[in-house]
């Protein structure tokens, strides 16, 4: 039953922070979403997720949880399982889709089985990557279960040897063939594709380019041939469905213009996209006529268990 505000879930707990390498990004998303939801008429409690999260949520007993967590434990199925156990409706994808999307290697297997275009990749340990070229250069090395381009290395064709990785790299690394071309991203909202964004940055679209002011420019909608735009929409929607995503997802692609349609490659799908007003998915929602409070409210009203 709708509350006095006319909302199905008038009392919302916004989960943010957590203990992953993306904590600061999550806090930024969480504070932005909290302010937007208050503007939309919700009663909001901000929750910095910690070891006592189950107790905190049980005491708060919110009508729904807005998940603004990023990275490990927040978007890999862990907190989703806790919310299912507590039977609190929550936003974004459920346990299985979240776990699959966070595991890049398994997500790629799902994409390949669905006939989506992916590039060659293998799993390796840091020791193996440091010892020899796992793939012919150029290739990319990145953690198999991290987001926000944390810990990404590019090995160029003229590299003298394998990369000297940081000592704190996780044991599961994905090594994949480097895909040249334009950086594109597409948000799916429910069963609707919002838009394609062309991301312009100086060099690799890394953590700094994503979050440092002026680190990149976003062109919405991307200036693309109609058949490429249509193909981007199709790939993003099929990826969303193949993983079983709910709420919103954002799929990242590369397009090598010289190869036409054959140059369009799906890199990964993110079940917990950044959620500040200037993040990629909210920008696309704004292009489609949704204010940031309306976009956040849509996510809350879409919340459920058994996702």
Swiss-Prot record:
Which family is this sequence assigned to?
Answer: Belongs to the D-alanine--D-alanine ligase family.
Q: Which UniProt keywords apply?
A: ATP-binding, Cell shape, Cell wall biogenesis/degradation, Cytoplasm, Ligase, Magnesium, Manganese, Metal-binding, Nucleotide-binding, Peptidoglycan synthesis
Q: Where does ATP bind?
A: 135-185
Location of the protein in the cell = Cytoplasm
Q: What is this protein called?
A: D-alanine--D-alanine ligase
| Residues noted as binding Mg(2+) 1 in the record, renumbered to the chain | 252, 268
Name the Enzyme Commission number(s) assigned to this protein.
Answer: 6.3.2.4
Q: Pathway membership of this protein?
A: Cell wall biogenesis; peptidoglycan biosynthesis
Described purpose of this protein according to its UniProt entry: Cell wall formation.
- HAMAP family in the record: Dala_Dala_lig
Q: Name one GO cellular component term.
A: cytoplasm
Pfam families in UniProt: Dala_Dala_lig_C, Dala_Dala_lig_N
Q: Which residues form the ATP-grasp domain?
A: 108-301
Instruction: Quickly give the catalysed reaction.
Output: 2 D-alanine + ATP = D-alanyl-D-alanine + ADP + phosphate + H(+)
According to its UniProt entry, the protein's GO biological process terms are: cell wall organization; peptidoglycan biosynthetic process; regulation of cell shape
Which InterPro entries does this entry report, sorted A to Z? ATP-grasp, ATP_grasp_subdomain_1, D-Ala_lig_Van_CS, D_ala_D_ala, Dala_Dala_lig_C, Dala_Dala_lig_N, PreATP-grasp_dom_sf
Q: Name one GO molecular function term.
A: D-alanine-D-alanine ligase activity
Q: Where does Mg(2+) 2 bind?
A: 268, 270
- Textual note on the cofactor: Binds 2 magnesium or manganese ions per subunit.
**Cofactor(s) needed by this chain:** Mg(2+); Mn(2+)
Provenance organism: Cereibacter sphaeroides (strain ATCC 17023 / DSM 158 / JCM 6121 / CCUG 31486 / LMG 2827 / NBRC 12203 / NCIMB 8253 / ATH 2.4.1.)
Q: What is the predominant subcellular site recorded for this chain? A: cytoplasm
